[in-house]
């Protein structure tokens, strides 16, 4: 299954999602925001703690369903020595996701930073001997 990939996600967040609860995340990494700009509600997305530069076949992660998505611009205001400096704006994406299944990367497509990160993934199977 070819899908968008969100990389560098905290292992704690992935572990919490695996417990079955929907969770709202705020992502600020440029590559993740660019990827989410092309994702629609209801889409399945791959999430992994592996960094974008290191993503390759065999890397583990999870498939999540995007329930809500919002991309917005925020102003960053910093204070130093009692002076006010408006330094920059920051774009961020807030997404509400729900865990679907464990998954493994079959292949990864890495283009430019301005293009979404795409992966071909397979759902992992788990069998218990009884």
Task: Name these PLM-found stretches.
Residues 31, 53-54:
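Amphipathic, positively biased hydrophobic alpha-helical segments used for protein targeting
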Residues 36-53:
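Short coil-to-beta transition motif at edge beta-strands of beta-rich domains
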Residues 31, 70, 101-103:
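Beta-strand elements of well-folded, non-transmembrane domains
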Residues 68-77:
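Short, conserved beta-turn/loop elements at beta-strand boundaries and strand-helix junctions
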Residues 1-41:
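Compositionally biased, charged N-terminal/linker segments
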Residues 38, 51, 59-62, 74:
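Aromatic-rich, lipid-facing transmembrane alpha helices and their immediate juxtamembrane interface loops
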Residues 58, 63, 76-130:
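Contiguous surface segments at macromolecular interaction interfaces
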Residues 42-47, 66-68, 95-99:
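Hydrophobic beta-strand residues in large extracellular and virion-surface proteins
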